Amino acid sequence: MARFIFITGGVVSSLGKGLASAALGALLQARGFSVRLRKLDPYLNVDPGTMSPFEHGEVFVTDDGAETDLDLGHYERFTGVAARKTDSVSSGRIYSNVLEKERRGDYLGKTIQVIPHVTNEIKDFISIGEDEVDFMLCEIGGTVGDIEGLPFFEAIRQFSQDKPRGQCIFMHLTLLPYIKASGELKTKPTQHSVKELRSIGLAPDILVCRSEGPIPQKEREKLALFCNVRPDSVIAAQDLSTIYDAPLAYHREGLDQAVLDAFQISPAPKPDLTKWEDVSDRVHNPEGEVKIAIVGKYVQLEDAYKSIAEALTHGGMANRVKVRIEWVDAEIFEKEDPAPHLEGFHAILVPGGFGERGTEGKIKAAQYAREHQVPYLGICLGMQMAVIEAARNVAGIAGAGSEEFDHEAGKKRFEPVVYHLKEWVQGNYKVSRKVDDDKGGTMRLGAYDAVLKEGSRVAEVYGGTAIEERHRHRYEVDIKYREQLEKAGLCFSGMSPDGRLPEIVEWTDHPWFIGVQYHPELKSKPFDPHPLFADFVRAAKESSRLV
């Protein structure tokens, strides 16, 4: 039976609850315990799949096809435990489930209310798989005091009462602002946040306090006194130069020991932090630097490409180099020559996206990389734009483009080298889609197999010809153009097992030019870098010696 750790936040959002949860999960693993992490989001969207990247940041996709919060990416990267659909839920999903049950008559004519029906649905979600692990860490999105979060806070209060004493603890993450004028850390916002938490029936066992620097002992004792926690359960979460120092930093602060003490687990197994010490060493002691341009549509919010940035960092670790990322707005290249902007970069990455805006700029970035022999990695839309560039400028397919852009414009303008994917095989089933289907949850989502061409670069990179990668797309390169494109030198080096869907393309006469329809960044980890990113950074390292 799992022990439950509920992580809440106060004062302000974006303090790092997800990272704190992931780091704690990693520390518990280092002591030999099994963990699973969950995210409960109070927003009313059913999932983040239809939310703007500017609004929400990256959508993290699981193997089983769930579109989830980017925090699940942190959970996977730090613990290596693959997230599932049952590890992410929103108010929208909870209310949808309750209303579906009401329509079916599951409640036998009762008046449906937040308490007990909504809270029971939340508790049922939290309980899924509780017999599988030693610790279940559940992060509640938002901050204490948000009206949207009240059903979740009430649900975890009830949940802790339903369980035997000592099976649930609460960890509260707050901000200790530093006032330069007085030279002081202020504890009052944290005190008020805990007061708000206690007013709804929740008392924190552990306080994690985000601050710019160390927390003096006097402030720790003050927080312990007024927030009713043990002094050694007041944990400093100082600003760090890299998120990969978080497990070691939290261990030095005693977070994992405070959790074990709260559960009265004694004697506690000693942690083995060897792999995190190695990760930290690789981050802080690089033997060189490479510059990589990410040419994207949502570069104003870097969280929109969170997993890509982290995967590049992992690739840097594998090659003992620091990866310096520079964000380039693809729209700039629709009006300007890309050469002055891209000269000096050791590699170019074009990530995914939706809609026509910025795509001509991405096509120009792919053209620049091809013509100037710069290592190029195109992901999802980045692969599609590389294929369109090849079709237009090498294969002689005039007017090559994507059906996505025609659908957006409401008229046919392009030769559809990229088309709307209407059916595909998922396991033993055929999935069908129409252009006018709902947007939510209708893409080709989750893990799919691919078969690589023997002797291709990607087969060499992966060390084999059978792979499984995660997807999130509704448009696909049309295989009917394959022969014409391959005659021009663009190799279709990865296909779906039935041979109908192109998964990978590469230029055979280029030092390193690969486009993939899937999202390899979603499976990369600091202690297990994805082979594509590791080899891409290796190619950038080679390129840096030539520039």
Curated annotation (Swiss-Prot):
ATP binds at residues 14-19, 71. L-glutamine binds at residues 353, 381-384, 404, 474. CTPSs have evolved a hybrid strategy for distinguishing between UTP and CTP. The overlapping regions of the product feedback inhibitory and substrate sites recognize a common feature in both compounds, the triphosphate moiety. To differentiate isosteric substrate and product pyrimidine rings, an additional pocket far from the expected kinase/ligase catalytic site, specifically recognizes the cytosine and ribose portions of the product inhibitor. UTP binds at residues 13, 186-191, 222. Pathway: Pyrimidine metabolism; CTP biosynthesis via de novo pathway; CTP from UDP: step 2/2. Belongs to the CTP synthase family. This is CTP synthase. It catalyses: UTP + L-glutamine + ATP + H2O = CTP + L-glutamate + ADP + phosphate + 2 H(+); L-glutamine + H2O = L-glutamate + NH4(+); UTP + NH4(+) + ATP = CTP + ADP + phosphate + 2 H(+). GO terms for cellular component: cytosol. Allosterically activated by GTP, when glutamine is the substrate; GTP has no effect on the reaction when ammonia is the substrate. The allosteric effector GTP functions by stabilizing the protein conformation that binds the tetrahedral intermediate(s) formed during glutamine hydrolysis. Inhibited by the product CTP, via allosteric rather than competitive inhibition. InterPro entries: Class_I_gatase-like, CTP_synthase, CTP_synthase_N, GATASE, GATase1_CTP_Synthase, P-loop_NTPase. Pfam families: CTP_synth_N (PF06418), GATase (PF00117). Homotetramer. Keywords: ATP-binding, Glutamine amidotransferase, Ligase, Magnesium, Metal-binding, Nucleotide-binding, Pyrimidine biosynthesis. GO terms for biological process: 'de novo' CTP biosynthetic process; pyrimidine nucleobase biosynthetic process. Residues 291-546 form the Glutamine amidotransferase type-1 domain. Residues 1-265 are annotated as: Amidoligase domain. Catalyzes the ATP-dependent amination of UTP to CTP with either L-glutamine or ammonia as the source of nitrogen. Regulates intracellular CTP levels through interactions with the four ribonucleotide triphosphates. CDD domains: CTPS_N (cd03113), GATase1_CTP_Synthase (cd01746). The keyword Ligase applies. It comes from Ruegeria pomeroyi (strain ATCC 700808 / DSM 15171 / DSS-3) (Silicibacter pomeroyi). The active site is at residues 380, 519, 521. CTP binds at residues 13, 146-148, 186-191, 222. The keyword GTP-binding does not apply. Mg(2+) binds at residues 71, 139. Its EC number is 6.3.4.2. GO terms for molecular function: ATP binding; CTP synthase activity; glutaminase activity; identical protein binding; metal ion binding.
